[in-house]
Structures are given as C-alpha cells and as structure tokens.
C-alpha cells in the first residue's frame, strides 16, 4: 500500500520536474523492484523521509547541525515499520525539532535525492533514497534533540552561509513552486 502511494508521488514528481529524469528513474526502479525498500534493515539502501520546514513568516528554514554527519541539513530520518513517507517526514520534523505544530504546505514531493551514507560502527555504507516535503511550523520555539548538535532558523537569503550542497540549495528554489501551486 505505502509503496504504491509512494510510486504515485514519484510519478507526479517526475512529470513536474522532467529535468530530473535520471534521479526519478533510479528512485522509481528501486521502489518498484525491491519490496523491502521502506525498511531500514535493507542494507544496500532504503527510503528515507525529510522536510524543508519554513517558519511562520516563510522567510527562514529550520536546519539541523547533524550529529553523525557534522553538516547543516534539513530534518528527517528513517521510516518506522509500515509508515507512509509523508507521515514519517512529519513525525521526524516534530521529534527532531520539538515543535508540535508543524503541518504540510503540500502533500506533493518537494525534492528527491539519492545519496551515499558513509560506513559507521553500526552500518556498512549504503544509499538513502530521500523523499522531501515542504512544511510550515506554527512557532519558532524548537528543542534540540539528541540527533543534532544544534538547530537554527536560517534566513533563506543566507542559506549559503550554512551549506553549499546543491541538494539543500535546490529545495529553496523549489519551495516557491509548491507554495504557489
């Protein structure tokens, strides 16, 4: 059920962003061909869910200084057994920020990214097939979780001060498509 729902979202995204054909095709192939794609236990890689959280005024985004990776990125994480990808992104947003009043601006995908996670003490190197959603927080009062070194509301026009990653900068550009849309 959740794989079928994810595939619908992926196909809609592919139609909206035809210049991302290669990433979309790789992601769709993975979800279609591996029934365990939503399970963290799949060692070669698995679907993850993350979120681009805008403040109430929509001029800042909440980023985490990720404890394991040591970089500033959007909040997100793994799906818990049988969870829908949008529900997982919303759960991760609330857990990692401590902000209870976060809601989707759109249920459509904001962005897709497939990236390598380096080997660590618990896991071999593997791929994250990250599905990203656009959310808005009802307040700016966050609490730092154990997964973060820090959290920050970053002005959208100063995003490059925190990250030069294409996948981060790309979400800033795409948010307007979903907001207007």
Task: Locate the predicted segments by residue.
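Histidine-centered active-site/metal-ligand motif
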Residues: 46, 66, 78, 126-128
